[in-house]
Amino acid sequence: MAFSRGQAGWALDLGTTNSGVACWDESLGRPRLVELPAVCRKLETSDPLEAPRLVPSVVHFLEKPGVVDRLGNWPPLARRFFLGQRALIGRPALERNEGVSHPAFVPTFKPALSGEALRPLARVGRESVTARDAANAFLRELLREIKKVSGQRVRDLVVTSPVAAFETYRAEVQQALRHLGVRRVRFVDEPVAAALGYGISLDHPRTVLVVDVGGGTMHVVLVRLSPKDAAAGEAAVLAKRGLPLGGNAVDGWVLNELCREMGHDLDADDDEVSRIWRRLMLAEACRVKEAVYFEQDVAFLMSPPGQTFRMETRPGGGTVRLDRERLRGILDQQGFYRSLAHSVEGVLEQAGLTAADVEDVLLVGGSTLLPGFFSFFEERFERRRVRAWQPFEAVAYGAACFAADRMDTLDFIV
C-alpha cells in the first residue's frame, strides 16, 4: 500500500486482545488496514478471517534497555523522535513468552486503564510496570512501526472507544498519544465505527444492536444512531450488557474436554512444569478452536506431560480431534449461547423494544466466528439485518472513515 504525503484518516482500534491500524486510501476511495509485518499476527496467510494484519495487544518490556533506549523516553525527544526501543509488542512479544511467561510480560492492559491505571501488571528488575506504563509502551512501539512502514509520523489520530469506557480511559489514551507527538486525538464510539465500517448509512436515525465478543468479554449494546450524534462520533446507548465471557474461556473449555478424553486431570498437579504445559496446551486449544472456523475437523497436536504424543495407548488409539459439531456441543454444555440469549433479551427488555424494532445487527470480534453464532442471530433477526462478514476490520474501517470525514462515502462495502 502506498502512502501519500500528509496521509489523512489515521485510525486505531485499540483492542483488549488485538489492535488494528487503518487509514483512508484516497486512490481507492476506501479504508485499508495498515500492514505492520514486524508485529502483526500472521505473515503467511492473506485470509481476512484469520486477522493476519491485526497486532496482538501484548507488551514485553526490555529487561536491560540501553542508553539510547532510555534517552528515547525523555519527553522532549519522545514527541519528535523514536529513539531506541522500550518493549516488544505484538507477535514478537508473544513469541518471547511462548511456553514460559516472563515477569516483564503484560498479556493485556486495556481493561485496567479505565480505573486502575496505576495497578502493577508486570515487573522489570525491581520496578513495577503499571497499566499506564504498558499502554504507553504499546502505543509508542506501534507508532514507531507505522513510521517505519509509511515513512510518516502520525500527528492526527482517531481512536475507537467502548461505549462503557469512563472518561479516565480516554484521558489515559489521549495523554499517552500526546506524549508521543500526536497533536490531535479524537475518539469515536465503537458502535458508530462498526456501523460505518459495515457500510450503514447514517443519514437518518436507526436502532442498532452491536455484539462484540473478543478474547475476554461479551458485550451486547443497543444504540440509537443519529446523523448529529454520529458526526460527533457518539452513540446514544439504550441498553447494554457485559459478561467476562469470550474466546479465552472457550479455549479453557476445549482444553478440559480434550484432556478428559485423554484421561488427564488438569488440576492434579500445580507445579511450575504443569503450569508451563497448561499454557502451551491452552495455546494449542486456541489453535484448533480457530482452525475449525475454516476446516471440518482438526487434530490436537499436543499431549499432556508424561503421555505419548500420539496417545496410542488411549482407548480407541489415534489422535484427539476437534470438529465443529463437537465445539458447538461444548459451547452448549457450558451455557455460552444461553448467556448470549440472556444478554440479547435483556437489552431489548431494558430498552422496551422487540427484535422487530432493531434495524441492524453488527457482529464484531473474533469469537463471533464460533459455530452457531451467526445462525443464532439469523434466526432471531433475519439474515438481511445481520452484518457479520468482517468482524475484525469493521471497527477500524469505520474509524478511518470518521478520521477522513468520509462518513457519506460508504459504497466500498459489498
Regions found by a protein language model. Name each.
Residues 34-180, 252-301:
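Phosphate-binding loop and its immediate beta->loop->alpha context
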Residues 1-7, 185-211, 350, 394-410:
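Conserved phosphate-binding catalytic cores of ATP/NTP-utilizing and phosphoryl-transfer enzymes
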